[in-house]
Design a protein with these regions (language model features):
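Exposed, low-structure sequence patches enriched in small/polar residues
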Residues: 1-482
Length: 482
């Protein structure tokens, strides 16, 4: 292990309108309203959301129903872990794990009970390898996915586990069933609620399991992403004879994210994060978490899954990569999983022809050196090491060639959870060929030629049609700065 680093950032901000005490001269403190205000904890930044209740209790706030501006707080917590490993020589592995939570609260302190709303976002690194290589299916099998089948089959099991947590619960005060024991016949945990579908989503697509039946998994479920680089092959004798360098690369990234969420206005907590909301149709209290989560997603990328970069002994460079990306979004609003994926194969080569002369052999010219006449073309190899790469005009007439080939396949699939069916929305297969040549004619003049060809074949012929585009040209670049 080469090095390990840990960083934690906690940023907190508060806006408290209607604060009556004036600011004092010593640490901003002033006495005269029962206690020293705004308090040393405020002066040194050691406050939290509980400070609003403290200010209200000490009479520091303007309690007027006409004051419509609530107190607001914003908190950002970010944890980042980094480690660099070198298990064998020339093999380096970088591990990264991050977890970021943002929370915004709005408190109507001027009303009884301090009505509070909360919103925020959540992201953390994870791994989703168990579903990465299963494929998305095709038109022949109805775009069947093993991960989606696992997800659908686990919904009832997880719903029963969530509902079991309410086994000894009683309905909260202020409802038609206040004080009575919970009965699922009056309205149980919905099969398509975020409390059920998000843990099933994590269990089917990632290695973190069901996240402890939580929409916001704890630190114990944090998993790292990684980058791998290996350059040791060029040290082998039989490889060194052909290649100057051989580099192999691999990188993996997977991030679980909860889009913007907000608390339910009718939420009534039972205990330990369990509570009830009023059903929009019946008005009866039903078990549900505090937050209305509309979308969660997993963003995965192999960039690349495998990459090889080599330099031959003649200085030709060749690069080949295979990249994949996948974005899976679970929507509680439409009760669907949208899966967008891409696969890229890229091959590129570059080579430079030094002192390339398309017009024949060396151009001879007579030059005078210290009183004697010589033929520049005949004596060029004896004038020093730099003359091998320099023409008689003192310019390297290099021809730089580059060829790139790429194949990209994209597909977007919608999976309906209620009907357990899948259908392709869009997709495309694109093949691209790019060739370029740059030739240095003189110190000030460079000639360039390029040719690009791209072919697009849509996945669904009903939405578009195949196209082919070609682009080529010749340019001359004249520079006055050389």
């Amino acid at each position: 292990m080469r090095n390990v680093s840990l960083s934690y950032r906690n940023q907190y901000a508060m806006s408290l309108p209607g604060f009556k005490p004036m600011i004092g001269d010593v640490f901003g403190q002033r006495s005269g309203m029962g206690a020293m205000s705004p308090g040393l904890d405020f002066a040194f930044g050691f406050i939290g959301d509980g400070y609003i209740e403290k200010a209200r209790r000490n009479g520091w706030l303007l309690m007027n129903d006409s004051l419509a501006t609530p107190a607001t707080t914003n908190r950002t917590e970010e944890l980042q872990l980094r480690a660099t490993l070198e298990p064998v020589r020339n093999l380096k592995i970088d591990l990264t794990a991050t977890r970021t939570v943002t929370t915004a609260r709005s408190v109507q302190y001027m009303y009884e009970g301090n009505p509070t709303t909360q919103s925020g976002t959540f992201t953390m690194t994870t791994t989703s390898l168990r579903s990465a290589f299963e494929g998305s299916g095709n038109a022949n099998n109805g775009y069947r996915s093993k991960s989606f089948d696992r997800f659908c089959s686990s919904l009832d099991r997880i719903r029963n586990r969530v509902e079991a947590r309410y086994a000894v619960a009683v309905y909260p005060a202020g409802t038609a069933l206040a004080g009575k024991p919970f009965n699922a016949e009056n309205g149980g945990v919905s099969r398509y609620s975020a409390d059920v579908m998000v843990p099933a989503f994590l269990s089917a697509y990632t290695e973190m399991g069901d996240g402890g039946l939580s929409i916001f998994p704890s630190l114990s479920h944090l998993l790292p992403n990684w980058t791998l680089r290996y350059s040791g092959l060029s040290k082998l004798p039989w490889v060194r004879d052909v290649f100057k360098s051989v580099n192999i690369s691999h990188a993996y990234k997977s991030v679980y994210a909860v889009g913007s969420y907000a608390s339910y206005s009718t939420y009534m907590e039972y205990m330990n994060g369990l509570g009830f909301i009023n059903d929009a149709t019946t008005g009866m209290p039903v078990p549900n978490s505090m937050f209305n989560v509309s979308t969660v997603s997993i963003n995965e990328a192999f960039s690349p899954l495998l990459g090889i970069d080599v330099t031959l002994q003649n200085n030709m460079t060749i690069k080949a990569e295979y990249r994949t990306t996948r974005v899976m979004s679970l929507s509680m609003t439409s009760v669907q999983i949208n899966e967008a994926s891409s696969h890229d194969w890229v091959i590129g080569a570059a080579y430079t022809l030094n002192n390339f002369n398309p017009f024949g052999g060396n151009r001879h010219r007579r030059v005078r050196q210290r009183g004697r006449s010589t033929v520049a073309g005949a004596s060029q190899q004896k004038t020093g090491s730099n003359s091998r790469n320099t023409s008689s005009s003192g310019v390297n007439n290099d021809l730089k060639l580059r060829l790139d080939l790429s194949l990209r396949k994209q597909a977007s699939i919608t999976r309906d959870i209620a009907t357990m069916t899948s259908a392709a929305n869009s997709g495309n297969t694109a093949f691209k060929l790019s060739f370029s040549a740059d030739y240095t004619l003189s110190r000030m003049l460079t000639m360039s030629f390029y040719y690009d060809r791209q072919t697009n074949t849509p996945l669904l012929s009903s939405s578009s049609y195949p196209t082919t585009t070609q682009d080529f040209g010749l340019s001359m670049k004249f520079s006055l700065t050389r």
